[in-house]
Amino acid sequence: MMIVIKTAIPDVLILEPKVFGDERGFFFESYNQQTFEELIGRKVTFVQDNHSKSKKNVLRGLHFQRGENAQGKLVRCAVGEVFDVAVDIRKESPTFGQWVGVNLSAENKRQLWIPEGFAHGFVTLSEYAEFLYKATNYYSPSSEGSILWNDEAIGIEWPFSQLPELSAKDAAAPLLDQALLTE
């Protein structure tokens, strides 16, 4: 069983599982195809699962894939805590350029559904975090795109006071208006 929590962008959903716990530990169903499709209102096929580990203050993103290789992602944090962000990059969307952010952690067990047409990123809040995501399309290097994490046109309110640790690629990412020129 999952509880759906709507966000400021209607297509991006927080999924909170029913957790059964006692002195031995806990159990929850992290994914059920039928339940998931009922919750989001359409059929989805996940073709790739990814797992990353990041230390505190590492920021990954904002990443997306273009065109027919666009990816929907169902993400969660299995160890530690992250602040996870989705940015609407669908040019015809009424929420284009808007973002939503949510804390995902091993403790709250929440997941975030990010449909195709969004850029995605996260920053690690705990000493380290292990992050899991299911993707609806295969990774395609020729279709990948990125947006600079601190683009003022988007205005993400990241929850940190010092500059994050970035890959060279993420640090050199273009602003939103430049990133979408090749669409």
Swiss-Prot record:
Pathway: Carbohydrate biosynthesis; dTDP-L-rhamnose biosynthesis; Bacterial outer membrane biogenesis; LPS O-antigen biosynthesis
SUPFAM superfamilies on file: RmlC-like cupins
Site (described: Participates in a stacking interaction with the thymidine ring of dTDP-4-oxo-6-deoxyglucose): 139
Transmembrane segments: none
Binding-site residues for substrate, renumbered to this chain: 24, 29, 48-50, 60, 73, 120, 144, 169
Gene Ontology molecular function: dTDP-4-dehydrorhamnose 3,5-epimerase activity
Pfam families: dTDP_sugar_isom
EC number per UniProt: 5.1.3.13
GO biological process, one term: dTDP-rhamnose biosynthetic process
Catalytic activity: dTDP-4-dehydro-6-deoxy-alpha-D-glucose = dTDP-4-dehydro-beta-L-rhamnose
Residue positions of the active site: 63, 133
Biological role stated in the UniProt entry: Catalyzes the epimerization of the C3' and C5'positions of dTDP-6-deoxy-D-xylo-4-hexulose, forming dTDP-6-deoxy-L-lyxo-4-hexulose.
Protein's name in the database: dTDP-4-dehydrorhamnose 3,5-epimerase
Organism expressing this protein natively: Salmonella typhimurium (strain LT2 / SGSC1412 / ATCC 700720)
